[in-house]
UniProtKB/Swiss-Prot annotation:
The gene is hemA1. During catalysis, the active site Cys acts as a nucleophile attacking the alpha-carbonyl group of tRNA-bound glutamate with the formation of a thioester intermediate between enzyme and glutamate, and the concomitant release of tRNA(Glu). The thioester intermediate is finally reduced by direct hydride transfer from NADPH, to form the product GSA. Disulfide bonds: none annotated. It comes from Pyrobaculum arsenaticum (strain DSM 13514 / JCM 11321 / PZ6). This is Glutamyl-tRNA reductase 1. One of its GO terms (molecular function) is NADP binding.
Length: 387
């Protein structure tokens, strides 16, 4: 058996739906996933809403799919190495509208950290996502795929510069997550000097070196009233810009939020990811030579992934065995003389069983079925049902 075969990916991306439709899907996917006990990882950006699971029962897959309503029939399901390949390609920027963009890697890391802390992304699925992040970093280090505009934020700034002189414009960025922070830095590089950031936490945006306002309905209204360009990059399921005040100064709103940060029908130009497709295509054509190099790295890492999963699997199983043996050792140590004897007993268990664990890792790398057989014998011998 190959452990990567347990991976399942459910995806809707910019290739299947427009940004507005993707925006509607994200809330439903999160809603059905939060109640699941299955290890899972959800990634939603401007360009994608994806759920990754490991060894899920068929009914769990169907539950997650239901969250994609009303676009369930468009969901792309991948399994095993195809699912891992897709995640690696996403991390590498190969599946982005702007090939090689860096925003997606930051969003992937943020989502991973958040979901690991919450206990959703765990066990072997955690290993897969960790490896994807490594692949994304390696591709950008070893290839030139990210030269030029580094993300959709960069593209949006280029788009705005064709219409407005940023050196004289008043610019507001709402949101200081990975996308918002990137926008601020690139706007400064592009010549924007009259720049304000609006964020839920003023402290978290203080290091950006610009004026920061706390996020509120009034601060958003002030941005629209007093600024020429407003960028939004806030993680929220409700629009933060629902209307534009009469006689507002704003000329362009750039909505980088996922889901959408702006309501439909605003009386000013709203730039979304869909607005940037033609510009992205131009730069993608310039990156063709680097795509093959990036794809070769992805394939190398897929081979390494199975080996890593086998080692991690042995470590997880061994941890449960060690816990069982430690418990016995501590009980015997307690009988023999208290704390010092307990510590000595634990140390003896570690020293005695470490060679067994290392041997199991070697066996698993070369023959996972044999490793599983050995562990099954241990499980039956000690009456451990949850190995």
């Amino acid at each position: 058996m190959d452990l990567v075969n347990g991976l399942v990916a459910l995806s809707l991306t910019h290739k299947e739906l427009g940004v507005d439709e993707l925006s509607k899907v994200a809330n439903g996917v999160h809603r059905v996933c939060v109640s699941l006990r299955q290890p899972l990882f959800v990634l939603h950006t401007c360009n994608r809403v994806e759920a990754y699971l490991y060894n899920p029962p068929d009914e769990v897959v169907e539950i997650v799919k239901s969250g994609y309503a009303p676009y369930v029939e468009k969901v792309v399901e991948r399994r095993g190495v195809d699912a891992a390949r897709h995640l690696f390609r996403v991390a590498a920027g190969l599946e982005s509208m702007l090939i090689g963009e860096t925003d997606v890697l930051g969003q992937l890391e943020e989502a991973f950290d958040r979901q690991v802390r919450a206990g959703y992304t765990r066990e072997l699925l955690k290993t897969v996502v960790e490896r994807a992040i490594r692949v994304g970093k390696r591709v950008r280090t070893e290839t030139g795929i990210s030269r030029g505009p580094r993300g959709l934020g960069s593209l949006s700034i280029l788009y705005v510069k064709e219409k407005i002189d940023l050196t004289n414009a008043r610019v507001c960025v709402i949101g200081a997550g990975s996308v918002g922070r990137g926008l601020v830095k690139e706007l400064i590089d592009a010549g924007a000097r009259r720049l304000v950031v609006v964020n839920r936490s003023v402290e978290k945006a203080a290091d950006l070196g610009v004026e920061v306002w706390p996020l509120s309905e009034r601060s958003v209204e002030r941005c629209l009233e007093d600024f020429d360009v407003v960028f939004t990059a806030v993680a929220t399921f409700e629009p933060i810009i629902k209307s534009v005040p009469r006689d507002a100064r704003v000329r362009i709103i750039v909505d980088m939020g996922m889901p959408r940060n702006t309501a439909a029908g605003l009386p000013v130009e709203v730039v979304t990811i869909d607005s940037l497709r033609d510009l992205a295509d131009r730069f993608n054509a310039m990156r063709d030579a680097e795509i093959k190099k990036a794809e070769e790295i992805v394939e190398e890492e897929l081979v390494a992934l199975e080996r890593l999963l086998r080692i991690r699997w042995v470590e997880e199983v061994s941890a449960k065995l060690l816990e069982y043996w430690f418990k016995i050792a501590e009980e015997e140590g307690e009988r023999a003389g208290g704390l010092e004897a307990k510590i000595a007993a634990r140390t003896t268990v570690k020293r005695t069983l470490l060679p067994v664990v290392n041997y199991l890792k070697k066996v698993a790398v070369s023959d996972i079925d044999e490793a599983y057989r050995i562990i099954s014998v241990l499980r039956l011998s000690y009456g451990l049902k949850d190995l």
